Regions:
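Pocket-flanking alpha-helical
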Residues: 145
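Zinc-dependent metallopeptidase catalytic helix centered on the HExxH motif
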Residues: 152-170
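Hydrophobic/aromatic residues within transmembrane alpha-helices
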Residues: 148-149, 256
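N-terminal organellar transit peptides
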Residues: 1-135, 140-141, 154-157, 172-325
């Protein structure tokens, strides 16, 4: 096929014949471009709106909610598998207290207790919270779990929940007889007679038992006095009835209510409705869950790390001596 010859329109100038397709593309808008831009703009606007709702509105107190913080598991000084770390829990309390959109705080408790120090740390932190705060005991809020509850302004409990157990305990493990049977021996070099108190490799002697008993009673007295301080204002509280349960017995929620250790019996929803009305949000308040923001891997590694740390601590320092409230 012959190739069209290019025409010269002047000296040194060559004109190319314009193709119909090129002219058509110039005259007709490209389909899909404007629509794509609109979708992109909508996505950007949506992201900005979500950012505004999640970050800016709470910071200026628009709307309102009650902050729900779960205390679920054994109370310890640091987080681990099945435990609640007091340090992180206190941070959650402070975060809720500093948010203008959180009008009140409810601690939802399901804990058998735990570390004396950790329980008291959370109790002390609750006393510094400025907002209205209540506790709800669901399945269990015993011992250290109840210690935490008395730091709030009002205690709800399910009638069938387990609470009470006001006391302290030190646990010692003795495997010396097993070692004798298996022919295993252990030698301890120590600077003082009681440096290895709590060791599992021999029975505790009389002086060690007396010392530990004094510490346990000191912790118990502090626990008891704290309960009297925080609960004596309840109209049902009776010191005579209270003395009867100081053998560290567990109580049902209903039994605790009858002697003034709990303010009201009810469900989780009723506790939230009570707090909602108390802070002016009505019986169906919006819920803001205050919780640690961690991924699965970080939580797993933290649990493993604390487990190793606890094992080393027990083996090198306090061995198997554990004080629980």
């Amino acid at each position: 096929m012959a190739v069209p010859r290019r025409k010269a329109s002047g000296a040194g100038e060559i004109n190319y014949p314009a193709s119909e397709e090129t002219e058509s593309q110039r005259m007709t808008p490209k389909k899909g471009v404007d629509g794509g831009k609109i979708i992109l703009y909508l996505i950007i606007a949506l992201v900005a709106a979500l950012f505004l709702m999640n970050f800016l509105l709470p910071s200026i107190g628009v709307g309102g909610c009650i902050g729900v913080i779960a205390l679920d598991g054994e109370i310890a000084t640091s987080d681990g598998y099945g435990t609640v770390g007091s340090e992180n829990f206190v941070e959650l309390l402070q975060r809720a207290d500093s948010r203008p959109d959180v009008k009140g705080i409810i601690i939802e408790i399901n804990s058998p207790g735990g570390s004396v120090v950790a329980s008291r740390e959370i109790y002390s932190a609750l006393l510094k919270i400025n907002k209205t705060k209540i506790a709800y005991i669901s399945e269990m809020g015993a011992s250290g779990g109840y210690y935490v509850a008395v730091g709030t302004d009002y205690i709800f409990a399910d009638p069938a929940s387990i609470t009470g157990s006001i006391g302290a305990v030190a646990t010692l493990l003795d495997i010396s007889q097993l070692m004798n049977k298996t022919g295993i021996s252990e030698t301890t070099i120590k600077s003082g007679a009681m440096k290895d108190i709590g060791t599992m490799y021999r029975p505790a002697n009389e002086n060690e038992t007396m010392l530990l008993n004094a510490i346990v009673n000191e912790i118990f007295t502090d626990f008891k006095d704290t309960v009297v301080l925080e609960r004596s204002g309840n109209e049902r509280f009776s010191n005579t009835k209270f003395q009867e349960v100081l053998d560290a017995r567990i109580l049902s929620g209903k039994q605790a209510y009858n002697i003034g250790l709990v303010d009201q019996l009810g469900t989780r929803q009723e506790a939230r409705a009570y707090l909602g009305e108390a802070v002016g949000l009505g019986k169906n308040p919006q819920i803001c869950r205050i919780q640690a923001e961690r991924g699965f891997l970080s939580s797993l590694m933290e649990s493993i790390g604390h487990g190793i740390g606890d094992t080393l601590t027990k083996g090198i320092d306090v061995q198997n001596l554990r004080l629980f409230s």
